[in-house]
Protein backbone atom coordinates (compact mmCIF):
# COMPACT_ATOMS: atom_id res chain seq x y z
CA UNK A 1 0.00 0.00 0.00
CA UNK A 2 1.33 3.44 -0.93
CA UNK A 3 1.75 5.98 1.84
CA UNK A 4 2.76 9.57 2.12
CA UNK A 5 6.52 10.13 2.11
CA UNK A 6 8.01 10.87 5.52
CA UNK A 7 10.91 13.25 6.06
CA UNK A 8 13.12 10.38 7.22
CA UNK A 9 12.68 8.67 3.82
CA UNK A 10 13.62 11.70 1.73
CA UNK A 11 16.79 13.48 0.66
CA UNK A 12 16.60 17.18 -0.23
CA UNK A 13 18.61 19.36 -2.58
CA UNK A 14 18.40 22.74 -4.28
CA UNK A 15 19.18 23.11 -7.97
CA UNK A 16 21.21 25.94 -9.46
CA UNK A 17 19.73 29.34 -10.28
CA UNK A 18 18.02 29.70 -13.66
CA UNK A 19 17.56 33.49 -13.74
CA UNK A 20 15.17 35.25 -16.05
CA UNK A 21 13.32 38.58 -16.28
CA UNK A 22 14.81 39.89 -13.03
CA UNK A 23 13.91 36.72 -11.16
CA UNK A 24 16.01 34.11 -9.39
CA UNK A 25 14.59 30.62 -9.98
CA UNK A 26 15.64 27.55 -8.02
CA UNK A 27 14.30 23.98 -7.91
CA UNK A 28 13.65 22.55 -4.44
CA UNK A 29 14.02 18.79 -4.93
CA UNK A 30 12.94 15.86 -2.75
CA UNK A 31 14.24 12.38 -3.64
CA UNK A 32 12.89 9.13 -2.24
CA UNK A 33 15.81 7.53 -0.40
CA UNK A 34 13.77 4.63 0.97
CA UNK A 35 13.09 1.17 -0.40
CA UNK A 36 9.36 1.68 -0.72
CA UNK A 37 7.14 3.72 -2.99
CA UNK A 38 5.54 6.76 -1.38
CA UNK A 39 3.91 10.01 -2.52
CA UNK A 40 4.05 13.77 -1.94
CA UNK A 41 1.30 16.28 -2.63
CA UNK A 42 1.30 20.02 -2.12
CA UNK A 43 3.89 22.61 -1.22
CA UNK A 44 7.21 22.40 0.58
CA UNK A 45 7.80 24.42 3.67
CA UNK A 46 10.98 26.44 3.16
CA UNK A 47 12.92 28.79 5.42
CA UNK A 48 16.20 30.61 4.85
CA UNK A 49 18.26 30.33 8.05
CA UNK A 50 21.59 31.46 9.47
CA UNK A 51 24.24 29.21 10.99
CA UNK A 52 22.29 28.98 14.27
CA UNK A 53 19.13 27.87 12.46
CA UNK A 54 17.30 31.18 12.95
CA UNK A 55 15.12 32.46 10.09
CA UNK A 56 16.69 35.42 8.26
CA UNK A 57 13.92 36.23 5.75
CA UNK A 58 10.12 36.39 5.72
CA UNK A 59 8.39 33.06 5.12
CA UNK A 60 7.94 32.27 1.42
CA UNK A 61 4.43 32.35 0.00
CA UNK A 62 2.61 29.59 -1.84
CA UNK A 63 1.87 30.22 -5.50
CA UNK A 64 -1.88 30.57 -5.97
CA UNK A 65 -4.13 28.83 -8.43
CA UNK A 66 -1.77 25.98 -9.29
CA UNK A 67 -2.87 22.36 -9.42
CA UNK A 68 -1.46 20.19 -6.64
CA UNK A 69 -0.91 16.76 -8.18
CA UNK A 70 -0.09 13.68 -6.14
CA UNK A 71 3.45 12.71 -7.16
CA UNK A 72 4.34 9.05 -6.73
CA UNK A 73 7.99 8.49 -5.84
CA UNK A 74 9.43 5.06 -6.44
CA UNK A 75 12.79 4.44 -4.72
CA UNK A 76 15.29 6.96 -6.15
CA UNK A 77 12.62 9.09 -7.90
CA UNK A 78 12.30 12.84 -7.31
CA UNK A 79 9.75 15.64 -7.13
CA UNK A 80 10.54 19.34 -7.44
CA UNK A 81 9.00 22.67 -6.50
CA UNK A 82 9.88 25.99 -8.16
CA UNK A 83 11.13 28.67 -5.74
CA UNK A 84 11.17 32.13 -7.30
CA UNK A 85 12.05 35.59 -5.99
CA UNK A 86 13.11 38.97 -7.37
CA UNK A 87 16.84 39.32 -7.89
CA UNK A 88 17.97 41.52 -4.97
CA UNK A 89 20.67 43.16 -7.12
CA UNK A 90 17.91 44.59 -9.30
CA UNK A 91 15.48 45.60 -6.55
CA UNK A 92 18.06 47.37 -4.37
CA UNK A 93 16.70 45.98 -1.09
CA UNK A 94 18.79 44.98 1.91
CA UNK A 95 20.03 41.42 1.71
CA UNK A 96 21.43 38.53 3.67
CA UNK A 97 23.29 35.41 2.58
CA UNK A 98 21.63 32.46 4.34
CA UNK A 99 23.68 29.52 5.58
CA UNK A 100 21.01 26.98 4.71
CA UNK A 101 17.52 26.37 3.38
CA UNK A 102 15.28 24.30 5.63
CA UNK A 103 12.94 22.17 3.52
CA UNK A 104 9.89 20.56 5.09
CA UNK A 105 8.01 17.99 3.00
CA UNK A 106 4.22 18.44 2.68
CA UNK A 107 2.27 17.42 5.80
CA UNK A 108 5.47 16.83 7.78
CA UNK A 109 6.89 18.79 10.73
CA UNK A 110 10.56 17.77 10.47
CA UNK A 111 12.83 19.71 8.11
CA UNK A 112 15.88 18.77 6.07
CA UNK A 113 18.71 21.34 6.07
CA UNK A 114 20.43 22.00 2.74
CA UNK A 115 23.47 24.30 2.51
CA UNK A 116 22.47 27.45 0.62
CA UNK A 117 24.82 28.30 -2.26
CA UNK A 118 22.44 30.58 -4.17
CA UNK A 119 23.84 33.87 -2.88
CA UNK A 120 22.03 36.83 -1.39
CA UNK A 121 18.28 37.04 -0.79
CA UNK A 122 16.11 39.94 0.37
CA UNK A 123 15.65 40.01 4.12
CA UNK A 124 12.85 42.57 4.14
CA UNK A 125 10.02 41.08 2.11
CA UNK A 126 9.44 44.53 0.59
CA UNK A 127 10.49 43.92 -3.00
CA UNK A 128 9.72 40.25 -3.36
CA UNK A 129 8.77 37.51 -0.98
CA UNK A 130 9.92 34.16 -2.37
CA UNK A 131 7.16 31.97 -3.80
CA UNK A 132 7.07 28.19 -4.00
CA UNK A 133 4.99 26.04 -6.34
CA UNK A 134 3.41 22.66 -5.60
CA UNK A 135 5.63 19.63 -6.16
CA UNK A 136 5.81 18.14 -9.66
CA UNK A 137 7.34 14.88 -10.86
CA UNK A 138 11.03 14.91 -11.81
CA UNK A 139 14.11 16.69 -10.53
CA UNK A 140 13.54 20.04 -12.32
CA UNK A 141 12.69 21.35 -15.78
Go through each PLM region and give its residues:
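Low-complexity, acidic Ser/Thr/Pro/Gly-rich terminal tails and inter-domain linkers that flank the onset
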Residues: 1-20
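Short, solvent-exposed loop/turn segments enriched in Ser/Thr/Gly
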Residues: 21-27, 94-96
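Asparagine-centered strand-capping/turn motif at beta-strand->loop junctions
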Residues: 28-35
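Short acidic, flexible loop segments centered on an aromatic residue
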Residues: 40-54
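Short, surface-exposed linear segments at secondary-structure transitions and domain or protein termini
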Residues: 49-52, 66-71, 120-130
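Surface patches in mature domains of proteins
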Residues: 55-62
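Intrinsically disordered, low-complexity Pro/Gly/Ser/Thr-rich segments with frequent PxxP/GP/PP motifs
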Residues: 62-88
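Extracellularly exposed regions in secreted/surface proteins, prominently low-complexity, repeat-rich
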Residues: 80, 87-88, 93-141
Amino acid sequence: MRRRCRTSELRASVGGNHPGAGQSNFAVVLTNGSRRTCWVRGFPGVAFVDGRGDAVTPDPERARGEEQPTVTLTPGASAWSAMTFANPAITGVTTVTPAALLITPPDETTSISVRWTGGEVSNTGKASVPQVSPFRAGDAP
